[in-house]
Curated annotation (Swiss-Prot):
Keywords: DNA-binding. GO terms for molecular function: DNA binding. InterPro entries: SfsA, SfsA_C, SfsA_N. CDD domains: SfsA-like_bacterial. Binds to DNA non-specifically. Could be a regulatory factor involved in maltose metabolism. It comes from Escherichia fergusonii (strain ATCC 35469 / DSM 13698 / CCUG 18766 / IAM 14443 / JCM 21226 / LMG 7866 / NBRC 102419 / NCTC 12128 / CDC 0568-73). Residues 201-220 bind DNA. This is Sugar fermentation stimulation protein A. Belongs to the SfsA family. It holds the Pfam family SfsA_N.
Amino acid sequence: MQFFPPLQRATLIQRYKRFLADVITPDGRELTLHCPNTGAMTGCATPGDTVWYSTSENTKRKYPHTWELTETQAGALICVNTLWANRLTKEALENDWLSELSGYSELRSEVKYGAERSRIDFMLQAGFQPDCYIEVKSVTLADHGQGYFPDAITQRGQKHLRELMSVAAEGQRAVILFAVLHSAITRFSPARHIDMKYAQLLTEAQQRGVEILAYKAEISAEGMSLKKLLPITL
């Protein structure tokens, strides 16, 4: 999936109020960007890092520029816009790039399900096969090649795992897909040191039939695609 119009480059001054970031452009202009990431963004928002941002044609937006990528001083590329996790997953599903999830004829998004009134990111259907429920999570937390999720305690994420376990218990196919949006990550694990309950639930979910996948995006300032399967350690 290509960025269009092309992204523009700047240098990060600071991120603040969770949703805002100040940057300076190569020609010396200071801009305030919208930051579409409510997480801790550990390692993704260091002052001095290169930022790649998009610009909306919507003239009514208070902040027309959106922070899309971080290029760290070590050279790693990170997609900080969490909306891309679902966009890339949808593109990969539509093109059968994820072999474990191929062979379905219908793809639906944001389907209501479960006792806790959740919405599943994607549902795959085909003939008389069990429906396939897919929950997508964006992974950007990295430590020496190891990717982790979550980067903060997530009650919502815990709820999604409980819902997926219920889906599996009903005989449907339940999948949690970790979309790794950090070029330096080579393997994935749940972040026990941050949210032990989530890590325990993920292990329990696997034992109860929930499938766990981690796919890494190829990232550049021109575009991204989700194609590479990564090893997982629970």
